[in-house]
Amino acid sequence: MFKILSRIGLAGVLALSSLSHAAETSPESLRIGYQKGSVSMVLAKSHQLLEKRFPTTTFSWVEFPAGPQMLEALNVGSIDLGSTGDIPPIFAQAAGADLVYVGVEPAKPKAEVILVAENSAIKRVADLKGHKVAFQKGSSSHNLLLRALQEAGLTFKDIQPVYLTPADARAAFQQKNVDAWAIWDPYYSAALLQGGVRVLKDGTTLKQTGSFYLAARPYAEKNGAFIQSVLDTFSQADALTQSQRPESIALLAKTMGLPEPVIATYLDH
């Protein structure tokens, strides 16, 4: 799944080479924002790869429920670097956030879906008309839903949007307070293995872009080369999902608080 990060190096070079003030030395600190589903980041954190590579830098890790909350923290200076889906940066920049794109991942069309109950009468996206759909506002799932509706000949006004964080959306979906749930992994894999759900639509035909790595502009301008090295370290962490798959699944299951079969399915997506 995360072969994607092997391509971040080039993206990082292209993005960071334009930052004329990039420094070769490691800075005093780096505050990293990550999500539960950030496999490469979670592995890098668990194995302390950054701490070992840059012993003079103090690293702090802050977990966020979704991209919008992470980028808000990045904008106000609470963190220096983060990774998020395709749409949150657009919302953040529209609100005036001074962020820099420093890396990109290819799209993962099977890792984000619209779910309905297994016995739901909703059989196709067009059937969502008039129904309640839960999702995190401003997230990549928001984008997935918009693109799916457009493909089906519907508009956003044709559904009843219910803006919820992943955890709250899962509860609402399980309690049948909403009719569908647009969500990403590992929440998707967890729901799938729990049973009682059906994938209405994934991103295969929707031409979505991948996730992005973003940094606060002041930090990136001073530490461009260092950020490139950090992304390279994340790529090394990602490689562990291939070279040490069983160990990585066990570690991710422990740190994410999810069963190993959920993690295995997540990586397959």
Language-model features, listed with the residues they occupy:
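Short, glycine-/small- and polar/acidic-enriched structural segments
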Residues: 24-155, 160-163, 179-183, 200, ...
